Swiss-Prot record:
HAMAP family: 16SrRNA_methyltr_H. It is found in: Cytoplasm. PANTHER family: 12S RRNA N4-METHYLCYTIDINE METHYLTRANSFERASE, S-ADENOSYL-METHYLTRANSFERASE MRAW. It comes from Burkholderia ambifaria (strain MC40-6). GO terms for molecular function: rRNA (cytosine-N4-)-methyltransferase activity. Belongs to the methyltransferase superfamily. RsmH family. One of its GO terms (cellular component) is cytoplasm. S-adenosyl-L-methionine binds at G35, G36, H37, D55, F79, D100, Q107. Pfam families: Methyltransf_5. Keywords: Cytoplasm, Methyltransferase, rRNA processing, S-adenosyl-L-methionine, Transferase. Its EC number is 2.1.1.199. The gene is rsmH. It is an enzyme of class 2 (transferase). This is Ribosomal RNA small subunit methyltransferase H.
Amino acid sequence: MGNELQHRTVLLDEAVESLVTRPDGIYVDGTFGRGGHSRAVLARLAEAGRLIAFDKDPRAIETAQRIEDARFSIVHDSFASMRDALAARGIEKVSGVLLDLGVSSPQVDDPARGFSFRADGPLDMRMDPTRGESAAEWLARASVQELTEVIRDYGEERFAFQIAKALVARRAESDRLGPLDTTGELAQIVGHVVKTREKGKDPATRTFQAIRIHVNQELADLQVVLDAALSLLEQGGRLVVISFHSLEDRIVKRFMQAHASAPAVDRRLPIRAVDLPSPPLKIISRQFPSEAEVVANPRARSAVMRIAERVTP
């Protein structure tokens, strides 16, 4: 319960107000977390409405199972499974999809989960600790090239190659020092390599972000769920996505723009604009947390919410 109290849902009212356009519709919360958005959606739904939520984190599932509401169900899986999971429930169309990306405060604040460089803990970083390869396991086998690519591409870290070499050098000392399996040591290694300091940011921030994204396949899953959401939305249905770093937001922005624009056609061809198929999406807005929300919850500072609506059947 303590962890739930520590988590403040970002852009709560704005997201739910943008999402729920039909109280008797079927909605999807792709990232249940500690249930802030889901509970607010349920409060707006009519008796005939339904909400299906997804989460990989077993602790999120435990929290969700305490919601006693016949309109609500939870799926213990990545939101990338959305299309198949809804099909298995006989659902072909939904009125809205909400995605609140990234890690939740309880995940970051619990050293045992291995997401944070601020407190020492096991080097795990999996959203679902019961499935897949942990960060420590991946670091124990990844090549310098793979490490460099992940840290550079997912962390936008300009010292990626130097960090990768340091990690592989540390691995060569495993017989003497034991495996690299704590967040504290990883942060220390990165701190020795990254000599420049960004104001208000720990030198390990970008590397931890990169490894977390890789371990959880976050960007690949995001692309899958955006495609699924587009096919699942009914006409008038809303896609609401909250991102917390530029990599996620760039994918969401480009996806919405691509599907809200008419297809490109060679001007030399005898085709009129009115004869082209209409784009399936209309971009509604982009929103940021208010100053008051950022003061109350500093982790909201980097959030950006994008909203699009399905305009074709």
